[in-house]
Every structure is written in structure tokens, then in C-alpha cells.
Amino acid sequence: MAQLMNKAKNFVAEKVANVEKPKASVEDVDLKDVGRHGITYLTRICVENPYSASIPVGEIKYTLKSAGRVIVSGNIPDPGSLKGNDKTMLEPAIKVPHSALVSLIKDIGADMDIDYVLELGLVVDLPVIGNFTIPLSHKGEMKLPGLSDIF
């Protein structure tokens, strides 16, 4: 009886592991807004849903790092859902306080940019499987706004 149960568990685990899952990629990270409290960057994430039904996105977890240090991290609850058999563009905004950027002053240099790594976890609710996190990572260079951008 125990062998039969183990075979059944292995069969189900194998089928679940081979279920097609949504695919995602970071398309772009751009400066969106400069305010008194910080800078807002707009992240564009393209997600492809292989299912005919729409899939809800529970949250987007993010961590923005530079020079091996975390600049900002957080989560964006309920950013929407993924259209069935289609690509959906999600555009979460990431707010970075000025104080976090000041701590990176030695990395900025003369060209006013920061090398960064953006780590994202896109949490989708798949039928039968439950919550599934799609891990994403994007490396790039952030241009900091000049005084003319602020005033």
C-alpha cells in the first residue's frame, strides 16, 4: 500500500512540475517622477499567460540593490491580472527616497548614474498549484535627475 501511495505522489508531483507556467521579463526601467520625498522609477514587466483564463497577480515583491547594498525593497499588492492567452504589461512604480540615494554618493561618479540590480518576484495564483513566484532579475544603469529635472 505504501508503494502505491509513493507512486501516486510521484506521479502527481511530476505532472505539476511539468505544468506550463507564465513567463515574464523586465522590459525597461525608466525615471517616472522626481518629487520632494524621492524619485519614482517605472518598471515595465511583460508577462505571457499560456492559459485561456485570466490569472490574478497577488503581489509583486521587489528589491533594488546597488554596490552590494539594498537601496529599497517592498511589495506592491494586487497589481491586476494576466489576460488569457496573451501578453500583459505590468508597470509597477518603485519609489526611492533621496536619503537612500545620498548613501550611494561614492558609486554615482561624474556621469550621475548608478549601476543597479533589480530583483522581482511576481506572485501569481495558478489553479491547482496555488501561489507561484516568477523570479526576475534585471541589471542596468539609473540616471539620476539633475537640478533642471527637479525645478
UniProtKB/Swiss-Prot annotation:
GO CC terms, sorted: cytosol
GO biological process annotation, one example: cellular response to salt
Keyword Transcription among record annotations: no
InterPro entries the record matches: Lea14-like, LEA_2, WHy-dom
Induction of its expression: By desiccation (leaves) and by abscisic acid (ABA) (leaves and callus).
Segment forming the signal sequence: none
Keywords assigned: Stress response
Superkingdom assignment: Eukaryota
Coiled coil: none
Family, similarity comment: Belongs to the LEA type 2 family.
This protein's name: Desiccation-related protein PCC27-45
Source organism: Craterostigma plantagineum (Blue gem)
Upper taxonomic lineage: Eukaryota, Viridiplantae, Streptophyta, Embryophyta, Tracheophyta
